[in-house]
Amino acid sequence: MKFEYTFEGMTLKVLDETFAGKVLEFYSRNREEFDRYEAAKPNNFYTTEYIAATLKAEYAALLKGEFGRFFLFSDDLPGEILGSVSFFGVTSINRSCRIGYKIDKNYRQLGLGSLMVKHMLEILTHEKEMHRIEAYIHPQNISSINLVKSLGFISEGTAYSYVKLNGSWQDHLRFVYIS
């Protein structure tokens, strides 16, 4: 697996700890939107030190094939993080994993999420030979539900009490992409 992929004027790139400031800007700018659908973060999450340590750990995990987070950049906006897509929960015997993604609030409804996830699916199915890729989505996240459906994900029902959000356990819809 490579650390950088280019397509249609875009780049998906793994970042190391030297990009902690840029990644922190991306997360901080989108904190309110991202926190609606993500589990609680540690108190020190929004610090350069925490982000740097996370990027270093994620880089090492990619080398082992356990996890990967790629950040989305556009040729038109060099240096600006537009989104991220990650894979995790890799089960090699079943050739399966889960996928997560997010787009900067300033670049939504432009097709970037679909483009980013589409290319990550190609990478996962061709390079990592994943057969089954799951996405768990909060029922109120209609944009995300529409995104996965447009890319051929199939609904498998509800994962009850799947993630603790804002102090309470929340159901999520489970979708699967079969290569």
Q: Each predicted region: which residue ranges?
A:
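Conserved GNAT-fold acetyl-CoA-binding loop/helix
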Residues: 35-56
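A short helix-loop-beta-strand connector motif used in the catalytic cores of GNAT acetyltransferases and
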Residues: 43, 56-71
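Generic alpha-helical scaffold signal
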Residues: 17, 28, 45-49, 66
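Acyl-donor (CoA/ACP) binding surface of acyl/acetyltransferases
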Residues: 1-22, 26-33, 73-179
